[in-house]
Each structure stands twice: as C-alpha cells, then as structure tokens.
Amino acid sequence: MERNLRKKRLGRVVSDKMDKTIVVAVETKVRHPLYGKTVNRTTKFKAHDENNEARFGDRVFIMETRPLSKDKRWRLVEIVEKAK
C-alpha cells in the first residue's frame, strides 16, 4: 500500500501514560439519519509515539500503519499544537 493513500486523522492526546504509546481521541460530526441533528462522535485510537514526545492535551496528526501490537494500528506523524 502506498503511504499517501493511508488514512490520516487529527485528534487530541487523552493519555500518554504508556511507553511509546499515546491514546488519541478523534472527534467526527455525523448527521443523525432520522432527525438530522449533527452529533459529535468520539473514537479513541492507540498510536505509536517512538520518542515519547506527545503530551496530554496536544493536537496531533496520526497515520494508519501496519499492526504494531494487539490494539495499535496508527503512528504519530506530527504535533500540530502543544497543550498549554
């Protein structure tokens, strides 16, 4: 699979307590099929952070990759905004 065809997501780090792993919450807006209201859906992804550089609250880009463990299929691409 070519790298530029892989899925990319923008999310916020909600946990950095594991070694070389972060949990990223990605929020998507979905319209309700019957009522039409826009609903926020949150999905959590475990992502590989090789240098342990991302911290709680950072906004980060993650990219899909090969399975790295039982739950990890994403890797950190860049830190867009540091937490205050």
UniProtKB/Swiss-Prot annotation:
Highest taxon, organism lineage: Bacteria
PROSITE patterns, A to Z: RIBOSOMAL_S17
UniProt family annotation: Belongs to the universal ribosomal protein uS17 family.
Any one GO BP annotation for this protein: translation
Residue runs in coiled coils: none
GO cellular component assignments: cytosolic small ribosomal subunit
Name this polypeptide is given: Small ribosomal subunit protein uS17
Subunit field text: Part of the 30S ribosomal subunit.
Keyword presence, Zinc-finger: no
Keywords carried by this UniProt record: Ribonucleoprotein, Ribosomal protein, RNA-binding, rRNA-binding
Function: One of the primary rRNA binding proteins, it binds specifically to the 5'-end of 16S ribosomal RNA.
One of the record's GO molecular function terms: structural constituent of ribosome
Record bears the keyword Transport: no
NCBIfam families (alphabetical): PRK05610.1, uS17_bact
